[in-house]
Amino acid sequence: MWSDNETTQDLLGYQVHADLLRKIILNDAMLPISIGVFGNWGSGKSSLMLLLQQSLHEWEESHQNEHSIILQVYFNSWQFESYDSTKLTMIESILEALDKDINTRKNVFERADDLLARINFLKVGVFILKKAYDNLTPDWMKKWLPKKDDIDKITGKDKYNNLLEDVTKGNTSKFIATFRELFGDLVNDMGYKAVIVYVDDLDRCDPKRIIGCLEAVKLFVNVKKTAFVIGADERIIEYAISQHYPIQMKKEDISSPFSDYLEKLIQLPYKLPRLSDNEQETYITLLLCKNHLNEIHFNQIHQKYLEFRKTDKHSKYNIDDIKANIPENQNIDFYAVEYRLPIVPIIKQFLNGNPRQLKRFLNTLYVRQELADVAGFRDIRPDVLTKIMVLEYNTLYNSRFEELYKLQNENGGVLPLEDVEQEAKTEEGIQNPQWKDNWSSDYLKQWLSSEPSLKDINLQNYFWVARDALKNEKPIASLVTSKVM
């Protein structure tokens, strides 16, 4: 099976996207900048951000000088969703990262103690601001503030005294403005080339938390040397904005006010494209190799694939290419991979090219094949099972999956197809009265006419292993138990 977690092991050819974003961030003239890595659920946004982090780290390692230090901060907004103020929690995370970096590399930073004192002061300010959100009085807040002697040790004393005054008076808007200025001074004095903050899983949060994170980004968006990289489905972000700012669109508006708000905040929208057919075939083939070959062999295959992608961004990298790049003295058994490759054309044709959906589909297929093996169904073909499952995965047509089950159940496991598969290929379309009404859409005709043919195949065992997807059927666990006991 395949893990559903984000990864730096690039099977999608996303390194080119990471390299482009790295080039933008390393251009001093482009900072400060906010980048929106936009894509649908499961499109690989988190993995792209990990690749970008890795790419920037490699650049930093290869440029060991005083102007090459890059601080990268990862903030998962979903994990902090339960916090009272997601915005301030994000700010705290950035300050904690600065603090940790200085303590780790004290020998690199001049006046490290002074920098730490300034960070601690800002951290206290954020803590107090959190309490202000709880409607605590300025008098109560004073006890949390540093003493005057501590303030005097910090450079830029007047600015910090102004911050102190803003907090004690409960002037939160002025506090934010002063905080931004002080934070900018701090980043500059620490000598960073860039401070990069990755905000991930924003689209998993509720609208209130989404707005809180966006407001935190807005706070820093004009601070020199900073870059925010935000991974999200922009449709969900626009929906959150519409819930928070319920503005009525006017007839003369040519764009949504909510998308306008997002455009002001995100200076560079970067949309991940849907995987092409060639990219899907490559991805599925590599996933099969990863699952069915040992780690050493797969790492060799993956490295050759990365080299291939550097010069060819369009072509598929299929099993023939993989075999052609295996050294002659190396004997790798590809049987388990090649046995499953007939599933690729069906998946390319009928799923939507979303990496996470492809992986989850393969995981479900794998579990059902294992179930078939445990149940003693040795004749289950991966391509036939895949063809049935793509209907189950299509929300528009999963009722046809139910219909197929009933049809085969009423006919001893064999669908009464007659000439339906051939009719689906003709201009006249399906004429068989049993199939004509419910199976004449372009998608379903394409499905019926696609390989493999289901004619004369007994599908009882196929639907048995897929019964967890059927309505009003017994739980699959009980079926397995009764079958193997």
For the regions a protein language model found, what residue spans apply to each?
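The feature marks long, low-complexity, polar/acidic/proline-rich intrinsically disordered regions embedded
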Residues: M1-Q15, D19-L31, I35, S43, ...
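A short hydrophobic beta-strand->loop->alpha-helix junction that borders the nucleotide-binding pocket
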Residues: V73-S82
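Conserved NTP-binding/hydrolysis module of P-loop NTPases
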Residues: D84-D101
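Sensor-1/coupling segment of RecA-like P-loop NTPase cores
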Residues: V221-D253
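Conserved P-loop NTPase catalytic core
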Residues: M249-L286, K290
